[in-house]
Amino acid sequence: MSHNDTIVAQATPPGRGGVGILRISGLKARGVAQEVLGKLPKPRYADYLPFKDVDGSALDQGIALWFPGPNSFTGEDVLELQGHGGPVILDLLLKRILTLPGVRIARPGEFSERAFLNDKLDLAQAEAIADLIDASSEQAARSALNSLQGAFSARVNHLVEALTHLRIYVEAAIDFPDEEIDFLSDGKIEAQLNGVIADLDAVRTEARQGSLLREGMKVVIAGRPNAGKSSLLNALAGREAAIVTDIAGTTRDVLREHIHIDGMPLHIIDTAGLRDANDEVERIGIERAWQEIEQADRVLFMVDGTTTDAVDPADIWPDFIARLPKNLPITVVRNKADITGETLGISEVNGHSLVRLSARTGEGVDVLRNNLKQSMGFETNMEGGFLARRRHLQALAEAANHLEQGKAQLLGAWAGELLAEELRLAQQSLSEITGEFTSDDLLGRIFSSFCIGK
């Protein structure tokens, strides 16, 4: 579709409400104002006016706001009509506007896309709009707002600028090889490169925090039947989310709870007890359990402390450990400490965290909560933090790889041309975050996930 079209969409959620807003952007927005309002409102002033139908009768009355381009969110002429929030009223007004030639319904995210294309915000800021709307916690909302205000983009742009200066220095060394000073081996380039690598590592650390805050961590509770998995889910969720009985195999399907631990979002998943089941329904539940385990960020290996004294997961259930995906983090949870009399707390066994608790009484559950938070490196207070998406992490990782490759070329062979190329590729990877180098397909995927009126 052409970006020269004038677009309209409801900017408020569907349904009944006190206020309903229609947003219009494009060349014909001025004509819409004159047709529907009978006048062009004073720029950036609220004007209380009737909204008129084709025959001049009033459809509604409310506030009209006129933002002539380029001083608007999209960079185009923008008109906002704020009327009553009834779906019938808004639908009538929308149909009235669509009778005007050259006006069409906006695609999802098209207002933000136009703002990006008109240099009103970069791609990371545009994504932050959707993240702010979807934020599931106060900290996520604050971090999304920081990204919208340019905190993440500023960090990325600083890295791009540093790489630009470094590339200039390297290119000079390549173009003037007969100078008395060997720029490639005088130590200055290596020092600057190490500085950029260190700055990039710091941004990657914050970005991982931001991604965790946005995406959440997927934690799967797994183990044999009657180990207390559902009781632990209830204890972590703070409510009776799962049915708990003494009957083995009570949980046959996957149960999900979304919780927060000091601002960190977690997707807690309770699964069917793992065993050789004869019942077809239970077998399906066990298959689903393994599917969830294979996609987990961490597994809580639930152990009934009354059935074994072993603490090493390989000794407790070697077949289970052997089937787990390689490098999948495990926390061993020895349950029923209220019965065994074990000392509550946390220790480490063969590189795995071991938590002793009672899911029934709740004793020791806070220790597990802290373990989950610390295991992901999550910081409760992230002043100035920003949200990040998986594509951001990938771009940062690619940039880091190019810088390490460039450093190897510099130290191994003093190969200036190869170093310059790696620096260029690193710069390009970083620029993908803000949208300076981004394919149209990626833009389409990003903005299509937005709300219609954003």
Curated annotation (Swiss-Prot):
GO terms for cellular component: cytosol. InterPro entries: G_TrmE, GTP-bd, GTP-bd_TrmE_N, GTPase_MnmE, MnmE_dom2, MnmE_helical, P-loop_NTPase, Small_GTP-bd. It is found in: Cytoplasm. The keyword Calcium does not apply. Keywords: Cytoplasm, GTP-binding, Hydrolase, Magnesium, Metal-binding, Nucleotide-binding, Potassium, tRNA processing. The keyword Cytoplasm applies. Mg(2+) binds at S230, T251. GO terms for biological process: tRNA methylation; tRNA wobble uridine modification. Binds 1 potassium ion per subunit. Its EC number is 3.6.-.-. GO terms for molecular function: GTP binding; GTPase activity; metal ion binding. PROSITE patterns: G_TRME. It comes from the Bacteria. (6S)-5-formyl-5,6,7,8-tetrahydrofolate binds at R23, E80, K120, K454. Exhibits a very high intrinsic GTPase hydrolysis rate. Involved in the addition of a carboxymethylaminomethyl (cmnm) group at the wobble position (U34) of certain tRNAs, forming tRNA-cmnm(5)s(2)U34. Belongs to the TRAFAC class TrmE-Era-EngA-EngB-Septin-like GTPase superfamily. TrmE GTPase family. This is tRNA modification GTPase MnmE. It comes from Salmonella paratyphi A (strain ATCC 9150 / SARB42).
